[in-house]
Regions:
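Acidic, metal-coordinating catalytic segment for phosphate/diphosphate chemistry
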Residues: 1-20, 26
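Residue-level preference for beta-strand/loop junctions
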Residues: 13, 40, 88-92
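Conserved Nudix-box catalytic region and its N-terminal flanking loop in Nudix hydrolases
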Residues: 27-66
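NUDIX/MutT-family hydrolases
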Residues: 40, 95-97, 105-142
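Active-site segment of metal-dependent pyrophosphate-handling enzymes
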Residues: 68-103
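Acidic/histidine-enriched, glycine/proline-rich intrinsically disordered or flexible terminal extensions
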Residues: 137-153
Length: 153
């Protein structure tokens, strides 16, 4: 038990998922959402893993809820766990690479949806929230080199 642990219990990170969704009809693009809730801004689709749910099912569910897309998960990309990555609480995110067909439609926590070339994020007109700029940069590096991001502390 540490000084940050509440008396009589543990404070564990909250599991989340984020999804890098590539559209079959728009190569070189990713799907982004404008968050309705704080922190507001552009983000990758994603959210919290529900109790009793595995991370892959959570990714498919969150993608459908926020974009209306039925995604096919291609690979588990990386885990991001910096305690400062989410200003609301300590989260850890399992990030997936997925593909989908069709037009995304904003729903649930998404106030808007955008399809943006991943080498031109400035076209979104605002910054990415959380650590999503790092995730996208790591993904671009992976696409160019085949090298996954190193573990971070």
């Amino acid at each position: 038990v540490s000084a940050t642990t509440p008396p009589g219990g543990y404070r564990n990170p909250v599991p989340t998922v984020d999804i890098l969704i590539e559209l079959d009809q728009a190569p070189g693009t990713l799907v982004f959402i404008a968050r309705r809730n704080e922190p507001r801004g552009w983000a990758l689709p994603g959210g919290f893993v529900d109790a009793g749910e595995d991370v892959a099912s959570a990714a498919v569910r969150e993608a459908k809820e926020e974009t209306g897309l039925d995604v096919e998960l291609h690979e588990q990309f990386h885990v991001y766990s910096d305690p400062r990555r989410d200003p609301r609480k300590h989260t850890l995110s399992v990030v997936f690479i997925a593909r989908a067909s069709g037009e995304p439609v904003a729903a649930d926590d998404a106030g808007a949806v955008a399809v943006c070339r991943f080498d031109d994020l400035a076209a979104l007109g605002g910054p990415l929230v959380f650590d999503h700029a790092t995730i996208v940069a790591d993904y671009l590096h992976y696409r160019r080199t085949g090298q996954r991001p190193p573990p971070r502390r």
